[in-house]
């Protein structure tokens, strides 16, 4: 296991999509964070996802009544959490993937034109391989989704 010596120092906010792509492996159509607007090292991050009608999932989910799939809302929360973990200088190199999703609840639909405000709070890190994050997705100040997300390092 190697330590990530290339983890960036404290970033200048906001983080634009180009910077986020330097931190996370996700690319279109699964790069779901447009901007990081708040970041506290090793603790929390807040990101923005602008939901647009031209995203591929809306072709079939659902014709005539487009709704952002819940799994993509959860993935967007996870990507914000991934920024926290990736910027931790003592974390090993590798790919963090889902190990579990607990207590996820969806409270309101997310539709094209909405702006998701995605919050991630780091709850725990175990053996530098497992992380637990509390995520929330808000639209217009209303809770759209929340839950605990667990990650595991794949080397």
Curated annotation (Swiss-Prot):
Coiled coil: none annotated. This is 3-hydroxyacyl-[acyl-carrier-protein] dehydratase FabZ. It is found in: Cytoplasm. It catalyses: a (3R)-hydroxyacyl-[ACP] = a (2E)-enoyl-[ACP] + H2O. CDD domains: FabZ. The gene is fabZ. The active site is at residue 61. GO terms for cellular component: cytoplasm; membrane. GO terms for molecular function: (3R)-hydroxyacyl-[acyl-carrier-protein] dehydratase activity. Involved in unsaturated fatty acids biosynthesis. Catalyzes the dehydration of short chain beta-hydroxyacyl-ACPs and long chain saturated and unsaturated beta-hydroxyacyl-ACPs. NCBIfam families: fabZ, PRK00006.1. It comes from Synechococcus elongatus (strain ATCC 33912 / PCC 7942 / FACHB-805). Its EC number is 4.2.1.59. InterPro entries: FabA_FabZ (IPR013114), FabZ (IPR010084), HotDog_dom_sf (IPR029069). It is an enzyme of class 4 (lyase). It comes from the Bacteria. Gene3D superfamilies: Hotdog Thioesterase. Its main location: cytoplasm. GO terms for biological process: fatty acid biosynthetic process; lipid A biosynthetic process. Belongs to the thioester dehydratase family. FabZ subfamily. Pfam families: FabA (PF07977). Keywords: Cytoplasm, Lipid A biosynthesis, Lipid biosynthesis, Lipid metabolism, Lyase.
């Amino acid at each position: 296991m190697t330590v990530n010596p290339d983890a960036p120092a404290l970033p200048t906010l906001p983080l634009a999509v180009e910077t986020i792509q330097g931190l996370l492996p996700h690319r279109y159509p699964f790069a779901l964070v447009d901007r990081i607007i708040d970041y506290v090292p090793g603790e929390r991050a807040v990101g923005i996802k602008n939901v647009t009608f031209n995203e591929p999932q809306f072709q079939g989910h659902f014709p005539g009544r487009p709704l952002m799939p819940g799994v993509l809302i959860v993935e967007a929360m996870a990507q914000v959490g991934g920024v926290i973990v990736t910027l931790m200088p003592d974390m090993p190199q590798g790919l963090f993937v889902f190990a579990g999703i607990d207590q996820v609840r969806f409270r309101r639909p997310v539709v094209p034109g909405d702006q998701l405000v995605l919050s991630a709070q780091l709850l725990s890190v175990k053996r530098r391989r497992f992380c637990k994050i509390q995520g929330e997705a808000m639209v217009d100040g209303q809770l759209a989704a929340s839950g605990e997300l667990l990650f595991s390092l794949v080397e």
